[in-house]
């Protein structure tokens, strides 16, 4: 099933709703901490010292509840607290722990060597420093404890709600941060845990209840949906007896230039392996006889080009008059180059085509230079990697890498549908935001993005212009990389192999 995640402010509002229902905040904290302690005990059965790092807020209060329940089970527990002035439910949790004979050390009164010795002798550490309670850079005693933890401790680590050092909504690094083996999150997963870099620091995620039914206090619509291979069975492409090529839909690929002839054919291969009924590959006329035999299953359409071998705006007239009313999805940009002819063609298509359009590769660079025409009528999906996204947003690749949710939201607000490629690719249109938890570094090879653009085109042609179709395509592409890696192809793969493997994944959906 998909992972439905919520922004921290929505979960805080859910807590308030539970209180309005008559469940006191202290009871919610007790339920959450007790459930987390059960998960921790069942998973680790700690026989040595357990060190629980408690921050100043409610996450620290959760930590005190966990400490008490682990102590009740017989664990040797020491709490290292950054606060000497707790209030409210957090203070009550500390008082109950102390009343049971619990041991608390104020971090400000313990030297670095003493903290290091305490952590170095632990068999388990629980991070209850901040959870989702920080939006700024980690500092003070919290930063000090995290730095000492990273220097001196290498054993299992459990985070409560979110690993310290990462934003609960965006997953952005807040400076120094912990890497958990297990994150016990309360009521529902937090959105930030779905995005890198936080995703790579969460470890296994377990959701613990707080004593109220989630459906009564959380919004009906999640802020972020995480999808992966297990969800493919719910996204199957339509197929029935008597289905023909027309039912499967036509994908038209428009690309190629004097320098890059193979890219559009890789997109055509992706579309075919992604299940399209027909694929038309429109390329500069000089490339048609050279590359056409590489993908004989596609129909190659020679198109007008200039003296450099780049497509011109007249290419749209040819493809529109030949196939316009039959095209269900258009893929534009692979290998197109960035010359004046290509730029004119992109502007022409954006202004003329009123169906689904997947804009990729050089088409994105042209879009960054010229902007989206005011008269654009197409249903646009852009598929940038982080460098192309940076060009479209007028920022740096580093910013995009470090702020993937913010980048995807900015792109979607400007251009419509977006697939921000990379670790945990982000799919977004309107307010619907999905994160695809599938993929492998072996996918970072030339032509991989061209193949993905074709698979997206095929999924849209089969399922319609819906976010689910795009998510399915991105999952297929990601799982193809994972399957190749598991078969010994963790490096040195070819883009065409990704397409072929995606077809095998697609064909095996009945086994999901």
Swiss-Prot record:
Region (NADPHX 1), start-end ranges: 58-62, 131-137
EC number: 4.2.1.136, 5.1.99.6
Residue positions binding K(+): 59, 127, 164
GO MF: ADP-dependent NAD(P)H-hydrate dehydratase activity; ATP binding; metal ion binding; NAD(P)HX epimerase activity
Isomerase recorded as keyword: yes
Binding site for (6S)-NADPHX 2: 335, 450
Ranges where the record places region NAD(P)H-hydrate epimerase: 1-220
CDD domains according to UniProt: YXKO-related
GO biological process: metabolite repair; nicotinamide nucleotide metabolic process
Residue ranges of domain YjeF N-terminal in the record: 11-218
PROSITE patterns, A to Z: YJEF_C_3 (PS51383), YJEF_N (PS51385)
Cited Gene3D superfamilies: 3.40.1190.20, YjeF N-terminal domain
Free-text cofactor note: Binds 1 potassium ion per subunit.
Region (ADP-dependent (S)-NAD(P)H-hydrate dehydratase): 228-512
Cofactor: K(+)
Similarity comment: family membership: In the N-terminal section; belongs to the NnrE/AIBP family.
Function, as annotated: Bifunctional enzyme that catalyzes the epimerization of the S- and R-forms of NAD(P)HX and the dehydration of the S-form of NAD(P)HX at the expense of ADP, which is converted to AMP. This allows the repair of both epimers of NAD(P)HX, a damaged form of NAD(P)H that is a result of enzymatic or heat-dependent hydration.
HAMAP family in the cross-refs: NADHX_dehydratase (MF_01965), NADHX_epimerase (MF_01966)
Protein name: Bifunctional NAD(P)H-hydrate repair enzyme Nnr
Origin species: Thermanaerovibrio acidaminovorans (strain ATCC 49978 / DSM 6589 / Su883)
The encoding gene: nnr
């Amino acid at each position: 099933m998909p992972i439905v995640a919520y922004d921290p402010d929505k979960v805080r509002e859910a807590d308030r709703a539970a209180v309005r229902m008559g469940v006191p905040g202290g009871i919610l904290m007790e339920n959450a901490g007790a459930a987390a302690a059960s998960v921790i005990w069942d998973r680790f059965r700690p026989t040595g010292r357990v060190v629980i790092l408690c921050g100043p807020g409610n996450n620290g209060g959760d930590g005190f509840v966990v400490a008490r329940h682990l102590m009740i089970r017989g664990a040797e527990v020491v709490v290292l607290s950054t606060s000497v002035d707790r209030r409210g439910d957090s203070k009550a949790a500390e008082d109950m722990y102390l009343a049971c004979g619990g041991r608390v050390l104020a971090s400000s009164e313990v030297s670095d060597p003493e903290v290091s010795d305490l952590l170095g002798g632990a068999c388990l550490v629980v991070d209850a420093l901040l959870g989702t309670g920080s939006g700024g850079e980690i500092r003070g005693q919290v930063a000090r404890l995290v730095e000492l933890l990273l220097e001196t401790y290498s054993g299992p680590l459990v985070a409560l709600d979110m690993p310290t050092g990462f934003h609960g909504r965006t997953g952005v690094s807040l400076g120094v941060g912990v890497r958990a083996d297990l994150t016990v999150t309360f009521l529902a997963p937090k959105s930030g845990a779905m995005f890198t870099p936080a995703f790579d620091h969460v470890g296994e995620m377990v959701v613990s209840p707080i004593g109220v039914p989630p459906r009564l206090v959380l919004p009906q619509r999640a802020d972020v949906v995480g999808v992966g291979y297990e969800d493919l069975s719910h996204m199957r492409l339509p197929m029935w007896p008597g289905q023909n090529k027309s039912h499967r839909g036509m994908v038209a690929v428009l690309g190629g230039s004097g320098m890059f002839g193979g890219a559009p054919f890789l997109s055509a291969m992706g579309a075919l392996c992604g299940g399209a009924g027909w694929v038309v590959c429109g390329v500069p006329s000089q490339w048609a006889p050279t590359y056409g035999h590489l993908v004989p299953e596609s129909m190659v359409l020679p198109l007008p080009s200039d003296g450099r071998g780049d497509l011109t705006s007249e290419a749209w007239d040819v493809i529109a008059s030949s196939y316009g009313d039959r095209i269900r999805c258009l893929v534009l940009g692979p290998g197109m180059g960035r010359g004046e002819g290509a730029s004119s063609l992109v502007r022409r298509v954006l202004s003329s085509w009123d169906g689904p359009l997947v804009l990729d590769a050089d088409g994105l660079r042209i879009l960054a230079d010229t902007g989206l025409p005011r008269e654009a009528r197409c249903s646009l999906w852009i598929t940038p990697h982080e460098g192309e996204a940076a060009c479209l947003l007028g920022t740096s690749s580093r910013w995009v890498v470090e702020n993937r949710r913010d980048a995807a939201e900015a792109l979607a607000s400007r251009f419509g549908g977006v697939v921000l490629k990379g670790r945990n690719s982000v799919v977004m249109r309107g307010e619907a935001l999905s994160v695809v938890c599938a993929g492998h570094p072996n996918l970072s090879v030339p032509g991989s993005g061209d193949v993905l653009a074709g698979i997206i085109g095929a999924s849209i042609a089969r399922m319609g212009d819906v976010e689910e179709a795009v998510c399915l395509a991105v999952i297929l592409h990601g799982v193809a990389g994972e399957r190749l890696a598991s078969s010994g192809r963790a490096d040195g793969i070819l883009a065409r192999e990704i397409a072929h493997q995606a077809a095998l994944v697609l064909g095996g959906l009945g086994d999901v």
